[in-house]
């Protein structure tokens, strides 16, 4: 396991998460009103938030899907962090030994893009939160920690837009000279099919 222990935390935690958190989720499932079925197909959890907090799954709390309004011209990568990866990021930024999941952080959904630039990668990340206190908690923990760890030559800018009636955060961490600062992408909520 020496190689595993030297891997970046996000890789180590992502390998272990499905087993440990998945086992906890199945223990919850076995005690729920769904115990005579299996969580496959349409019953499969759709977010790490649902796996971490099965009661949210049980009450039908589904993630809010965000999509960028502009085409991904120049984007290297686009995806969702999710609650689990945000927790790993917080643990890494605060240098705590373990990734804790005692309470739901109020994550509603997110979407990010990474762009290439001559001075380094640029991140544009939108999050949407269940309520205003959850957004404030994110800004005063994750965003403030990121600001302190911001690489030299980078700028971190956040705004707090309302996204489809929900409290949101737009976080941009990019080289100071990145040309994308003048034309930041926007997002919208993807409505589920009826």
Kindly label every feature range from the protein language model.
Residues 2-121, 126:
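Pan-zinc metallopeptidase signature
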Residues 108-194:
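C-terminal soluble interaction/assembly domains
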């Amino acid at each position: 396991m020496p190689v595993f222990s030297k891997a970046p935390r996000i890789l180590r935690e992502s390998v272990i998460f499905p087993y440990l958190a998945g086992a906890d989720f199945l223990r919850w499932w076995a005690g729920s009103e769904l115990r005579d079925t299996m969580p496959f197909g349409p019953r499969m959890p759709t977010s790490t938030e649902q796996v971490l907090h099965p009661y949210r799954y049980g009450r039908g709390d589904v993630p809010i899907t965000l999509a960028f309004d502009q085409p991904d011209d120049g984007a290297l990568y686009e995806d969702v962090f999710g609650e689990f990866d945000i927790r790993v990021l917080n643990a890494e930024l605060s240098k705590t030994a373990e990734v804790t999941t005692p309470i739901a952080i109020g994550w509603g959904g997110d979407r990010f893009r990474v762009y290439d630039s001559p001075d380094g990668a640029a991140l544009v990340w939108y999050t949407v939160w269940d309520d205003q206190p959850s957004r404030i908690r994110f800004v005063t923990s994750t965003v403030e920690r990121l600001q302190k760890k911001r690489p030299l030559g980078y700028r971190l800018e956040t705004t707090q837009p309302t996204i489809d009636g929900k409290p949101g955060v737009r976080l941009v961490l990019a080289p100071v000279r990145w040309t994308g600062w003048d034309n930041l992408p926007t997002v919208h909520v993807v409505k589920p099919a009826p």
